[in-house]
Amino acid sequence: MKKKKKIMILIILLLIFIPILYSLNTKNPPGTNVSSDFKDADCKFLYDLTYLKDGKRIHEHEIFKRELETIKNAEKFLMIDFFLYNDEYDKSMDFPNQVEEMTDLLVAKKKENPDMPILFVTDPINNFYGAYEEDNLKKLRENGIDVVVTDLNKMRDSNPLLSGGYRAYVKWFGTSGGGWIRNFFDKDADKVNIRSILKLANFKGNHRKVVISEKEALVASANPHDPSAYHSNVALVFRGKAMEDLIKSESIFFDKLPDAIENFKAEEVTSPYKLKVITEGKIYDEISKNIKETKKGDEINLGIFYLSEFRILRELGEAAERGVDVKIIADLNKDAFGLEKNGSPNRPALSELKEDYPDINIRWYQTSGEQFHTKFIYFKFKDKNPLAILGSANYTRRNLDNYN
């Protein structure tokens, strides 16, 4: 009897620990974690700002307008990748119908030119991880647009304790089908099932925000998602050979690209600006390298939505100790689409940073329901050209350590 009990315990332990060991060894697919070479590029910086002036809420917004313009002007192809693309929210609040507007424009574009490939990549959060199909994504698909929902099972696990068990014992049942749990994003939307909640709990995502045509490419911190319409954000629109590198980084979502995209050669440009494409862990490498290269008299200006990556926090502190002028503007992390948050991660992380390194100048962006959703760092060096890093990645472990 004791022998049987030991065997049973051993089997249970194996059933627990083998999936965890497997999860610990997962990796992101080939083609991620990219760092291209610097290339000449015609660039334009775009921004969205929401702020209060004389008691009035002011919106200075450029990014969504330029995305629509890029779509309108495309003649040969479009590649689009957005993390949040839905119009689900508490309808007691009021937001512009951005997703509907972009969806209608893409459908019209496809009808106008049926042979032009339009590839649209998004994250399964919009379908609540497979519980249902979001209406706008369904409309795109039904009108001949190639919609790819990122397969998060192919991504590296950030929480092996949970993800190991999920991979071994839950994912095989799928996530489609009705449920009884209220939708977190919209109380009037379809209810979701426990399997989709468990998939959400893996905390994975395709966090990119990219629009590419044969004429220009745009990388942003902004989602077109309706409840994100008033957030403050940054973007860069550019032309040049770096467009090919961005296309290559997006090609990982497709078995085969249409010929118009596969054979695309961007026009060479001559410009005082040089640009490189970086993704996943290479973003951290580039940020870290430039922070470490700063010297007394240099400046670091950081505008950020989430900052909790402990290596970056330490490196910023060490830069301040070297006499680098470090300025940070951060979101208070108190608002999320009508819900009140507790200030995590920024308030505790930056409060501790200020306590340990008093010379760092930290300001909180004053929001009124929206978010300071920016992901932007600017280095002003005394002895070489300035450098900016901006895009879709928050400064968190998941975004910068090859998880998302």
Question: What is the meaning of each model-derived region?
Answer:
Residues 302-307:
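Long, repeat-rich segments with strong aromatic
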Residues 79-91:
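Nucleotide-activated donor-dependent transferases that construct or modify glycoconjugates
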Residues 218-246, 387-404:
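Segments surrounding the PLD/"HKD" phosphodiesterase catalytic module and close analogs
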Residues 265, 271-278, 286-289, 311-328:
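Extracytoplasmic/luminal low-complexity segments enriched in Pro/Gly and acidic/polar residues
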Residues 241-287:
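Active-site cores of enzymes that catalyze phosphoryl transfer or operate on phosphate-rich substrates
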Residues 78, 82, 110, 144, ...:
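Sec/Tat-exported extracytoplasmic proteins
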Residues 70-79, 284-299, 318-320:
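Secondary-structure "cap/kink" motif recognition
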Residues 2-64, 72, 89-93, 100-216, ...:
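PLD/PLD-like phosphodiesterase catalytic module centered on the HKD motif
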